From Swiss-Prot:
GO terms for molecular function: beta-N-acetylglucosaminidase activity; beta-N-acetylhexosaminidase activity. Its EC number is 3.2.1.52. Pfam families: Glyco_hydro_20, Glycohydro_20b2. Keywords: Carbohydrate metabolism, Chitin degradation, Glycoprotein, Glycosidase, Hydrolase, Polysaccharide degradation, Signal. This is Chitooligosaccharidolytic beta-N-acetylglucosaminidase. The keyword Signal applies.
């Protein structure tokens, strides 16, 4: 009879034993795993099979359950789901060191993530097994970012008694242990039939990322973003194990960075006195990112992309030049004048204060794209300087002028940061592989590729020995596919880039035999047409698709990940991220039936 004590199980899943609850008896729907898909079926009164909620079913109906990004070394998810009491989760740090405060913050965040798995307006039953999480950080004194930091971890979950579940996370740094906590949070799901939290038992996961650099660029100059919106972005990044927030903080349209030594830059260049970033603001974001395993990488773009804020310095040329289409790619135009010796004192002051604000940065982005020869050539002062140096006013001579600027700026950056930290530049005519070695040392510079993934420059630079970060606009520019903001029609990089293309954008395919020189990739949100109100939907969940590509470099296509992608979108929304909807919820509940 149905009311007998039974064990709820299938071939692969055992939830527990006991009398079926009223919720189980009266649930109209249940899910069952068939051919690696969770199928929605009616829960008839005579049914004696397990009454599985959708998330419980999805946790076992795939080799990777609901994990995102999927682990890279070993993933064994056991056949048990145990009810747990969220109020009895205990986290213990087993080794002491200077990263303990970071682990404590990560542990608090883990509990918040577990709480967010319960839908708003509901409260999971305070019943079930207690959970003890042991955090084993083998190098508790490491708390600094680097390109060779160890982000690997091992995660084990077992049940030691009828009322207790143990989880152990081991890592060779705080960053690895933090990643393990993120994975553990994904192994806890809400059972909306029984109103319980469930954890997967008998788990072994060994995991590490394929690429060390996995980033998001946010442009906060075209439109201003609040500190809260930046923190929200970092929260979402941490949830999918992205590790670099690239802050494009100034541009020709605005200068929101407050500097004590050069206060007029923000006074003249910010959109308003309330739309600025102080040193305290930046340090707050840097610390917030560190606790979540996300470095905050500063960019100061030069010698182009300057304008507002620089009006009284006498250090720019062609600012607001008209028609703008002759001198730059978008209004207002503006470039620094490399011939002004006082410019480099100015830059050093900027770099010094950026070094103080972004105090934990292990790299510095110097911008360096879209420099206009015509802009420089419009200045009689620059022309005279070039003639005095016996340079012609041709393309090759303007490259010499650009190199003159870059060498001086590089020296000032090294001085300001107090070390010869890696420098990053965008692809440009200066980085063209046919002459890049004349200007940029491959051991000092990393090149960030923003042209297409088929650009011959990629192979050319790799063959010269340069390390690359991939941001090819045909797959990773998230501002593409909207209406033009200058003129009519669509914007320059249309069409819209869907998550499917993002997921399939493989640096390994682009690198061929030079894969070791690919540091990773970065999606970019240039903000001509976005602001805090549209931020979440522009980035998410597409950036999650990118995150799995960067973490795992999967050999499979997006179709194999689609059901997990739909779930990670749901997780982000529960966290308070207004992620864009990908499909009708019907598709989430009816896996495999929404195909084209």
């Amino acid at each position: 009879m149905w009311l007998q004590a039974i064990c709820i199980y299938t071939v692969f899943i055992i939830i527990g034993c006991g009398i079926p609850t009223a919720a189980e008896e009266h649930s109209l729907w249940r899910w069952t795993c068939e051919n690696n898909r969770c199928t929605k079926i009616r829960n008839e009164p005579e049914n004696k099979e397990p009454v599985l909620s959708l998330e419980a079913c999805k946790m076992f109906c795939d080799d990777y359950g609901l994990l995102w990004p999927k682990p890279t070394i070993e993933t064994n998810l056991g056949n048990f789901l145990s009810k747990i009491n969220m109020n009895t989760i205990d986290i213990q740090i087993t080794k002491q060191g200077k990263s303990d405060d970071l682990l404590t913050a990560a542990a608090d965040r883990f509990k918040t993530l577990v709480s967010s798995s319960v839908p708003k307006g509901f409260s999971a039953k305070a019943a079930g097994k207690s959970v003890t999480v042991y955090l084993v950080n083998e190098n508790p004194y490491i708390r600094e970012f680097s390109l060779d930091m160890d982000e690997s971890y091992e995660l084990y979950i077992s049940s030691t008694s009828s009322d207790k579940v143990n989880a152990t996370i081991r890592g060779n740094s705080f960053f690895g242990v933090r990643n393990g906590l993120e994975t553990l949070s994904q192994l806890i799901v809400y059972d909306d039939i029984r109103n319980n939290l469930l954890i997967v038992r008998d788990v072994t996961i060994k995991d590490r990322p394929v690429y060390p650099y996995r980033g998001i660029l946010l442009d906060t100059a075209r439109n201003f973003y609040s500190i809260d919106s930046i923190k929200r972005t970092i929260d979402a990044m941490a949830a999918v194990k992205l590790n670099t927030f690239h802050w494009h903080i100034t541009d020709s349209q605005s200068f929101p960075l407050v500097l004590q030594k050069r206060p007029n830059l923000s006074k003249l260049g910010a959109y308003s006195p309330t739309k600025v970033y102080t040193k305290q603001d930046i340090r707050e974001v840097v610390e917030y990112g560190l606790e979540r395993g996300v470095r905050v990488l500063p960019e100061f773009d030069a010698p182009a992309h300057v304008g507002e804020g620089w009006q009284d310095t006498g250090l720019t040329v062609c600012f607001k030049a008209e028609p703008w289409t002759k001198f730059c790619v978008e209004p207002p135009c503006g470039q620094l004048n490399p011939t002004k010796e006082e410019l480099y004192d100015y830059l050093e002051d900027i770099y010094v204060e950026m070094a103080e604000a972004f105090e934990s940065t292990d790299m510095f982005h110097m911008g360096g794209d879209e420099v206009s020869e015509r802009c420089w050539n419009s200045s009689e002062e620059i022309q005279n300087f070039m003639i005095q140096n016996r340079w012609n006013l041709d393309k090759s001579s303007f490259l010499k002028l650009w190199n003159y600027f870059q060498k001086n700026a590089q020296d000032r950056a090294y001085k300001a940061f107090g070390k010869r930290l890696p420098l990053i530049l965008w692809t440009s005519t200066l980085t063209d592989y046919t002459h890049v070695e004349k200007f940029l040392d491959k051991d000092e510079y990393i090149i960030q590729v923003w042209t297409t993934g088929a650009d011959p420059q990629i192979q050319g630079l790799l063959q010269k020995g340069y390390r690359l970060i991939m941001s090819n606009y045909d797959a990773l520019y998230f501002d593409c596919g909207f209406g033009a903001w200058v003129g009519s029609g669509n914007n320059w990089c249309s069409p819209y880039i869907g998550g499917q293309k993002v997921y399939g954008n493989s640096p390994a395919v682009m690198a061929l035999s030079y894969r070791d020189q690919i540091l990773g990739g970065e999606v970019a949100l240039w903000s001509e047409q976005s602001d805090p109100a549209t931020l979440d939907g522009r980035l998410w969940p597409r950036a999650a698709a990118f995150a799995e590509r960067m973490w795992a470099e999967p050999s499979t296509a997006w179709q194999d990940a689609e059901h997990r992608m739909l779930h990670v979108r749901e997780r982000l929304v529960r966290m308070g991220i207004q992620a864009e909807s990908l499909e009708p919820e019907w598709c989430y509940q009816n896996q495999g039936l929404c195909y084209g």
